[in-house]
């Protein structure tokens, strides 16, 4: 599964990214690769799941995922034009909102 955490800004996306890693730890799934830099947050887990955290903006066209975690503060135009079209990889897809 490929997932994207869409934050209103990179800081909010990063915070939810850290919480996601903790959530996986609760179910005993370990990260095998984690990349954290100024503008990039990627994690790959031992079960094959891959997640990245990015800022939701018009510049993020072309992203693809099965599941999207969207900051509740992201503008609805961005959700409709950027995030929903990006969330279309088969065999399944889901979109969920989060708040910090």
Feature locations, PLM:
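Short, flexible loop motifs at catalytic/binding sites
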Residues: 1-100
